[in-house]
UniProtKB/Swiss-Prot annotation:
The chain crosses the membrane at residues 11-31. It comes from the Bacteria. Gene3D superfamilies: F1F0 ATP synthase subunit B, membrane domain (1.20.5.620). One of its GO terms (molecular function) is proton-transporting ATPase activity, rotational mechanism. It is found in: Cell membrane. InterPro entries: ATP_synth_B-like_membr_sf, ATP_synth_b/b'su_bac/chlpt, ATP_synth_F0_bsu_bac, ATP_synthase_B_chain. The gene is atpF. Keywords: ATP synthesis, Cell membrane, CF(0), Hydrogen ion transport, Ion transport, Membrane, Transmembrane, Transmembrane helix, Transport. GO terms for cellular component: plasma membrane; proton-transporting ATP synthase complex. Belongs to the ATPase B chain family. F(1)F(0) ATP synthase produces ATP from ADP in the presence of a proton or sodium gradient. F-type ATPases consist of two structural domains, F(1) containing the extramembraneous catalytic core and F(0) containing the membrane proton channel, linked together by a central stalk and a peripheral stalk. During catalysis, ATP synthesis in the catalytic domain of F(1) is coupled via a rotary mechanism of the central stalk subunits to proton translocation. Component of the F(0) channel, it forms part of the peripheral stalk, linking F(1) to F(0). HAMAP family: ATP_synth_b_bprime. This is ATP synthase subunit b.
Length: 169
């Protein structure tokens, strides 16, 4: 101890300083180190929870995006089906309109043919009547006259003139 005194170290003062330093360390440990560690642990826990929440939000966003893509795909398929149905319906309507137009055209042709046949039959009947009348007239004139070639030709010419006059009337 004397050697320590020769060095200028006071032993009671040195022991007091060691005790004081120990007390200071104890107090710092109790009042500073533990609360700081608790705050650091709390902060670490909050960061971990925040990271977990971030991961959950990312997963939810990814699920929502997948759901959105799925719904868009379904909507696209439904839209395609609607378009296909509309095209099919349009084709059916167009085909029905074509068939109706064909049927109407055939009916009109049939009516026109019937009318033409009737008019032709009427004209033929009228010509037969006129021819019969002309034949009767010619026969009557033949009976009234004796026919030589010139008289015969004159008779034919007069009958034809009379027939054209009748047609004009």
């Amino acid at each position: 101890m004397e050697k320590l005194a020769e060095l200028g170290i006071n032993i009671p003062s040195f022991i007091a300083q060691i005790v004081n330093f120990g007390l200071l360390l104890g107090l710092l440990y109790l009042f500073a180190y533990k609360p700081i560690l608790a705050k650091l642990d709390e902060r670490s826990t909050r960061i971990k929870e925040s990271m977990e929440r971030t991961d959950q939000v990312k997963e939810q966003a990814q699920k929502a995006e997948e759901e959105f893509k799925k719904k868009i795909g379904e909507a696209s398929q439904q839209g395609q089906l609607v378009i296909e149905r509309a095209v099919k319906t349009g084709d059916e309507i167009r085909q029905k309109a074509i068939e109706e137009a064909k049927a109407e055209a055939e009916a009109m042709l049939s009516r026109a043919r019937t009318e033409i046949r009737q008019e032709r039959d009427e004209v033929v009947d009228q010509l037969r009547k006129e021819f019969a009348e002309l034949t009767i007239l010619a026969a009557g004139k033949v009976i009234d006259q004796s026919l030589d070639k010139k008289a015969h030709q004159a008779l034919i010419d007069s009958v034809l003139e009379n027939s054209t006059d009748l047609r004009k009337n």
